[in-house]
Regions:
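GH16 jelly-roll
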Residues: 1-127
C-alpha cells in the first residue's frame, strides 16, 4: 500500500492464490508526485514456495537493486529511484491476505487460517 514515506523496497510480496509465484517491487513517493511502481505486477517463479523455508534477499547498490530467491538472482531493477541517498526507503515483506477480489486474487475464507513461519530477518549495510 502506498504511504507518504519516501518509498519502499518490497523484498517479497506473496499471496496464497499465487501458488508458485511471488513479486518483488520498488515504490517511490516523496520525490515523485505521480507515484511510481516498478514491476509489482510481474510475478516471478518460485518452485515449492509453499513448502519449507526459503531465502529472499535484496542487494541495493548505487546503480541497481537485485532480488534473490533461494540464492538465485530473480530480478534486477536499474531505473529511476535506485540511487542511494535519493530518499529513504522502507524494506517490506508483504503477506497481506484479502477476503475480496483484489491484487492478490479471489480468496475463499474457508481456506483460512493461512500460516507463514519466519526464521529470521537480517539487514546489512555496505561499508
Amino acid at each position: 500500500m502506498p504511504s507518504q514515506s519516501n518509498g519502499e523496497i518490497d523484498i517479497v510480496e506473496y499471496f496464497g492464490t499465487w501458488k508458485n509465484r511471488w513479486s518483488a517491487a520498488l515504490h517511490w513517493f516523496a520525490w515523485n508526485p505521480n507515484y511510481l511502481c516498478s514491476s509489482g505486477d510481474d510475478k516471478l517463479p518460485a518452485e515449492d514456495i509453499q513448502k519449507g523455508y526459503h531465502n529472499f534477499s535484496v542487494v541495493w547498490t548505487d546503480s541497481a537493486i537485485y532480488w534473490y530467491y533461494d540464492g538465485e538472482l530473480a530480478r534486477v531493477y536499474e531505473g529511476d529511484g535506485v540511487a542511494k541517498g535519493s530518499a529513504g526507503m522502507r524494506l517490506l515483506i508483504q503477506l497481506a491476505p484479502e477476503y475480496k477480489d483484489g491484487w492478490g486474487g479471489t480468496y475463499d475464507p474457508t481456506d483460512y487460517p493461512y500460516q507463514m513461519k519466519t526464521d529470521y530477518i537480517k539487514a546489512y549495510q555496505f561499508k
